[in-house]
């Protein structure tokens, strides 16, 4: 899935895969890189790669798929990181108010989850028994 946000002068490319190493290798090959910033052999469920922002105005978001579907906790977590990278790229600082961040984060979550649902992707909403909602 690809997004383009002209207002923030940024492009976003999403990879949803069972094996994120394959996605990482595609990105490394595309950009002729041997190593990507901050990616090591630690197992992870999602990552936002922002090292291509200065040159290509491009952010990658990688989310691991499972048999249960795309984990919404992981997805929204990574969208938060995506939001902060977009805002930092545009010179916003998280100081007097966090409202611009919150507005973009809410819109991105809504648009991305809506697009996944529209495209028939299976979403998984894990239940955390330590958080009680009545």
Model segments located where?
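Post-HExxH zinc-binding segment in Zn-dependent metallohydrolases
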Residues: 93-126
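Catalytic Zn2+-binding segment of zinc metalloproteases
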Residues: 79-97
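Short alpha-helical catalytic segment bearing the HExxH-like zincin motif
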Residues: 70-78
């Amino acid at each position: 899935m690809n997004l383009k946000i002209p207002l923030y002068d940024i492009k976003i490319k999403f990879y949803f895969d069972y094996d994120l190493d394959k996605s990482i290798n595609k990105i490394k090959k595309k950009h002729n890189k041997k190593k990507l910033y901050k990616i090591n052999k630690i197992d992870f469920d999602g990552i936002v790669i922002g090292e291509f922002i200065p040159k290509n105005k491009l952010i990658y978001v990688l989310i691991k798929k499972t048999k249960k579907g795309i984990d919404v906790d992981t997805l929204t977590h990574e969208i938060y990181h995506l939001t902060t990278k977009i805002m930092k790229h545009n010179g916003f600082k998280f100081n007097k108010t966090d409202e611009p961040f919150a507005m973009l984060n809410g819109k991105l979550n809504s648009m991305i989850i809506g697009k996944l649902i529209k495209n028939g992707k299976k979403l998984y909403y894990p239940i955390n028994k330590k958080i009680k909602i009545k």
